[in-house]
Amino acid sequence: MKITILETSDIHAYVSTKSFTNPNKYENHSLSKVKTYIDEIKRENENVIYIDNGDSIQGSPLGTFYKNNNDLKNLAYVYNLLNPDAVILGNHDFNYGQDYLKSYINYLYAPVLSANTIDKNSFLDIRPYIIKNIENIKIGILGLTTQYIPHWERPENIKGLSFKSALETAKYYLPILKNEEKCDIVIVSYHGGFAKDIETGLELTAQTGENEGYELLYSNLDFDVFLTGHAHKEISGIYNNIAVAQPGFAASKVSEITLY
């Protein structure tokens, strides 16, 4: 059986190809182009899982326009057209406050995941993981978010929330997915990047805990696919026997992983 996994990340509300600064110019990146590509993949392949890895609603002039005009329903409508199987929370998804984020989550058709975001008031409809069944194959999708959000975000935007280590959270949930849920394939979708070189382990940035990708990848935890983001890098390859991807930002690329 062939299973195709698609990932977008850090779209930052770049919906249209039309330039925000020049009305006569069209960009090479946009959700409209992403949708065309995803639709093509789905036409050509029977078993496709598509995950958006977060930072969806903030970052472009259009995102600001939607916020200022309280027009979130139309932005969510665009994302629903892509029909993701799961959406992960990114750090910038908290920038406009929890009421705005809650509305976005409620408008989405897809489940929203972040296992290490702890909501003591249960205000946001978020889950740690979901399970997809494709014929006789059971696929677990675990969502994780960078734990560093309190260092950036306004306190009023994350009131009642706490953010745990992605690594420590994965240590808890991955055995559940493999041993209790009996998943054949486990995908970890982490809105975070790598603070160490993915091959050599050399430190690239300060080891603050913002980006736990390297630690997750080499943790000896049992998972098969590692989708990353946050750092706006392009990563594609097999590392430590795990398929790893990161698709850049602003809807410029789509990561594609094929499992047989």
Predicted regions, residues:
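Acidic, metal/ion-coordinating pockets
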Residues: 1-260
